[in-house]
């Protein structure tokens, strides 16, 4: 998939204030400082469209970017930032959880994990939450430039082995590095397949409650 145009649309404090749910959305999430906004910029081909920072917790709202006038990429707040106040964490958790549970045009959630680290408890709990609520997701491993090629192979195998028992079907994995553009084509191809296969809004937790 070739990106011809990508524009920032809006930042929202709640899923109810997000743009109309008339296009497929691919959202990005991960622990704070996993390289989420940098990855969004790499995929979009723009260095500063999504705001990045060495300080965790920079993204605090639901940020929508319209791509090729056809679909949205969404930069979500990261989770697991210990330095955030309890009130901040509660607010972010509520905002993100409601978006994931109720946003009917969420076609796929890209869960970003640092490839240098073994699967973390907070990530595994989050992935189980996605599975329990039938939220479609794929795994994106970041910062692959920080380790050797053999370590990348070994870590990828570790993630697949760890996550396999929890998932009902095989997951899509993409190995990336925002620094050297590794995995950009693979990520774009994955997004292209998701957008091409998007047909109708998914059944959300809100739909089930009605």
Curated annotation (Swiss-Prot):
One of its GO terms (biological process) is division septum assembly. This is Probable GTP-binding protein EngB. Keywords: Cell cycle, Cell division, GTP-binding, Magnesium, Metal-binding, Nucleotide-binding, Septation. Belongs to the TRAFAC class TrmE-Era-EngA-EngB-Septin-like GTPase superfamily. EngB GTPase family. Residues 22-197 form the EngB-type G domain. GTP binds at residues 30-37, 57-61, 75-78, 142-145, 174-178. GO terms for molecular function: GTP binding; metal ion binding. Disulfide bonds: none annotated. It comes from the Bacteria. Gene3D superfamilies: P-loop containing nucleotide triphosphate hydrolases. InterPro entries: G_ENGB_dom, GTP-bd, GTP-bd_ribosome_bio_YsxC, P-loop_NTPase. Necessary for normal cell division and for the maintenance of normal septation. It comes from Amoebophilus asiaticus (strain 5a2). Mg(2+) binds at residues 37, 59. Its cofactor is Mg(2+).
């Amino acid at each position: 998939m070739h990106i011809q145009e990508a524009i920032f649309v809006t930042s929202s404090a709640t899923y109810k204030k997000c743009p109309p749910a008339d296009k497929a959305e691919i959202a990005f999430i991960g622990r704070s400082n996993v390289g989420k906004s940098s990855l969004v910029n790499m995929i979009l081909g723009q260095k500063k469209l999504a705001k990045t920072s060495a300080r965790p917790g920079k993204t605090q709202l639901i940020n929508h970017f319209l791509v090729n006038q056809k679909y949205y990429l969404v930069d979500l707040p990261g989770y697991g930032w210990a330095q955030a106040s309890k009130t901040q964490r509660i607010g972010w958790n509520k905002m993100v959880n409601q978006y994931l549970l109720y946003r009917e045009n969420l076609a796929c959630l890209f869960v970003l994990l640092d490839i240098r680290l073994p699967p973390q408890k907070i990530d595994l709990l989050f992935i189980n939450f996605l599975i329990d609520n039938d939220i479609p997701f794929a795994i994106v491993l970041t910062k692959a430039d920080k380790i050797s090629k053999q370590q990348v192979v070994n870590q990828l195998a570790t993630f697949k082995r760890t996550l396999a028992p929890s998932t009902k079907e095989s997951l899509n994995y993409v190995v990336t590095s925002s620094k050297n553009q590794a995995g950009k084509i693979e990520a774009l191809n994955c997004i292209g397949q998701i957008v091409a296969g998007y047909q109708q809004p998914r059944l959300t937790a809100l739909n089930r409650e009605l």
